[in-house]
Amino acid sequence: MKVKTNYVNAPVWKEVNVKSRIPESLKMLEEMARNIWWAWNDEATEMFRELDPELWSFVKQNPVALLERLSYEKLEALCNNKEVLSRINHIYDKFKTYVNTKPDATRPSVAYFCMEYGLTHVLKIYSGGLGILAGDYLKEASDSNVDMCGIGFLYRYGYFDQSLSMDGQQIANYEAQNFGSLPIERVMDENGSPLVLDVPYLNYYVHAYVWKVNVGRVPLYLLDTDNEMNSEFDRPI
């Protein structure tokens, strides 16, 4: 069966600086949202869902997008709810105890390379079984406190969503990911500028930004070639 391809939203990005509006008493939510630990911790996932169940469904279970969209009134209500604050602090204490536990320095360190990682549906950098397996390896390495570092690629479009045309044909819809609303962070150099890796290819270089995903205790570094330094041919790498 032939599947048609449709890029549903070609992105036009502009750089902006956004100041967080999350109250101080809820700041720990931002830290937890930026670590994929919540993806395999039911208690943490349920905590985010209960902040605003309707909005949680709307943002497709993305805690970073959830916190960005919570209204001022909702944030104020959460700050004044002692039961909610107590639960958030309880889960945050468990999270900090988990991530602050150092690996056994006598065990060998591991560098894990893969083209895709299936960590959560929120981060579309996988397409099948290989990605799910790689994602599970990183999660298990985190739970087992293995000194591991993952390396991969950050894809702008990732895997596609399927829809049907009027005549019943399958259509592959590629929706661009907005990196600013994902549980990832840009890696900076010693001068505070975005870190760039220059990778030799044929007779020239491909330039890649570096992003970091916190997978519990395991850092995953992703290369991003979709930038103005590269040609239109190289940007989709």
Task: Give each language-model segment a name.
Residues 1-237:
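Catalytic cores of carbohydrate-active enzymes across secretory and cytosolic contexts
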